[in-house]
Amino acid sequence: MKKLVYVILTMQMNFYKMSIKQRGFCWRVPVLIFLICGYAPPAAAQKANTTDSNAIYLADPTIFQYKKNYYLYGTSGHNANEGFIVYTSTNLKSWEKSTAGNNGYALRKGDVFGTAGFWAPQVFQYHNKFYMAYVANENIAIAESSSPLGPFVQNVKAPLAAPVKQIDPFIFIDTDGKKYLYHVRLTNGNKIFVAEMTDDFLAIKEETLRECITATEGWENTANAEWPVTEGPAVLKHKNLYYLFYTANDFRNPDYATGYAVSSTPYGPWKKFSGNPIVSKRNMGINGTGHGDFVQGKHKELFYVFHTHYSDSAVAPRRTAIVNMGFLKSRNSGADTLRVQPGTFHYLKPKN
């Protein structure tokens, strides 16, 4: 390779001494060298370190920022039938399990709807209250609290009404104040839907319900399952476009991976990114990468928090990981591209 670089530099230095015919050949040589030697598909990531037992075991994680603190919630890797514990951090690196309230639980069974299967929480603030959208008994419910630490409770212990089972809520409040519930409905597969919500977050406006994402591409159903899965929606708005993150395949599948789609409206139609998946076992170095949420750092940097399998040979308990992300500016009038930075991948750890 050093010799090839030397040849190119020598040709460039003598460029203006050459004839027109020689100059034409000079331009072709670097291109040929690049085509022969310079192109290779992106290298696979190094294997993630799964030998460290000092880890946080939360699946379907979400991080909520309030003032100077970050709050981490997720589906428990040990007992998902009691509610949701919460970890806190000031720097997204060192995490401490909360001792406030119900033994560290931000939401606990008995205070809200649900007896089992407490999955996929999302916490957000609206006016002076904090809300947690979550799953229990394969239904979506929303609880409220005066603090991100909880306790999150319901005055009326009930789920959102729906004719089918539904999971994985993500509430997005648009810049015009309208509220949308992105969620998964279990109907001939796990499919992502959206509907506008009422201002009190107690119901959806049924007439606005739209299907957003189903498994239509090869990477989204690598097992050719009869019940294809797209789940774990998370939405952000960038330059007046909506970016919908989603994860495909059964969560037990090593190919569980994350991609995104873009739309000019909250309802779609959604155009899937041609480079999907952008978070996968290939670039993260571990199986089962997905179902996460976005969080912004204190310097406006963007992160994606998600879970992975425990190891290459075991699914559970799933580990909580995070990776940096950013937008690559479009060269034309199209959508900016979301890119992950695989070298920043690491697992979240509890404070010693």
Where are these regions (language model features)?
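Bacterial Sec-dependent N-terminal signal peptides
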Residues: M1-Q46
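Carbohydrate-active catalytic/glycan-binding domains of CAZyme proteins
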Residues: A45-N352
